[in-house]
Amino acid sequence: YVMGKCTFKGGCHPYDGKEFSKDKPIKELFPAVGEMVFPLSQHIGAPAKPVVAKGDYVLAGQLIAEAGGFVSANIHSSVSGTVKAIEPRTLATGGKCNSIIIENDGEFKEVEYTPMKFEDLTKDVILERIKAAGVVGMGGAGFPTNVKLSPKNPEAIDFIIVNGAECEPYLTSDYRRLLEESDKVVMGLKIALKIFDHAKGIIGIEDNKPEAIRIMQEATASEPDIEVKPLKTKYPQGGERSLIYATTGRAINSSMLPADAGCIVHNVDTIFSIYLSVIEGKPLTKRICTVTGDGVKEPGNFYVWLGTNYRQLLDAAGGPVGEPEKYISGGPMMGFAMYSLDVPVVKGSSSLLVFQKDIVSKTTSSACIRCGKCGEACPEHLLPAKLAGFASRNDEEGFTKFDGMECVMCGSCSYVCPAKRPLTQQIKAMRSTVLANRRKK
């Protein structure tokens, strides 16, 4: 941690690919008349429980499934129409999940929302409205926001950090939100700060986004408790641990939560959703998705109704160029390849990347040459090659002894490896094995 230069040790510099969509304003994408799919697990924790049945008519913004436990989240319909079925459907991850299927009638009849003024808000009202709206972390993890804002020791929270780094290559949705709706992002942060008595706000933005930094500095000029911190452009600067260390100098490990270091981290779109839910009274039924890559004709940033089919996202961007080689949900470093586009956009869907053949690497891995580049790139100061070796031998003891469970699966080691070894994938698989074995005990 170096004062005046917000960064962390390790990381890498992948080609950022943001020129495809960074200058494209957010465009609203109305869903086509027809089937909308709402999975009951769009968040970390217990699946939501349906409160509608087949044949029911629902309005846009209506609650269709309620939180199934303390760590869970409400789900609302983004459209008006009739419930066709409640059945398992495939997700972008490839897994199946029980889902509510609604036939969109194209009329978008909405429920009535109850707005509130900032001055009238109390801590309990803020948390209740966030919970009622089903707001979750929208950077991908999907942790319920009301739970994150209810730590065991609220007096210990010193900082609420807005993650505006957007360090994943190609993604530009947070950048566009900061440019176009800075006032609402600032208001969302002020609402979150109101829950804690002495917390300060930090908005971290990578220094390759000077326009966003300038706009947010102007938007916070009269806010003494909020500071905009330019971050050194490096991947994974937006990782929770890296961001906390870069902006505050505080370090956390896998046995700690950010709250243990006095910090709470929120994605830009999550903070925007806090504003929408608390001030305007609207539930989380839409999100921004970046559709980009050399495999689409017109890359852009779209404000998408949840439940919309990914195929419609591709059509909104002008359709594919030729025969794309690969579709990815999320970023190229931590996202996952998709085998089908017939899956719904959910709360954590940040993007659809479409790549042509010459961008997709098809190289074969070779033997490790002991160069040490993976260790230099690891933001957690691990030895990825050694951990991957333990994983390949299924050596759980060695893997945990050398802190394999501290891996944040950012992909930096695999990216820099000259032998093209799938280090992240091997470590990730071993982590899953260790966690599964711990649950058995």
Segments and roles (model prediction):
Residues A53-E66, A85:
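Short, well-structured beta-strand-loop connectors
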Residues A85, T90-F143, K152-E155, P210:
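Acidic low-complexity segments
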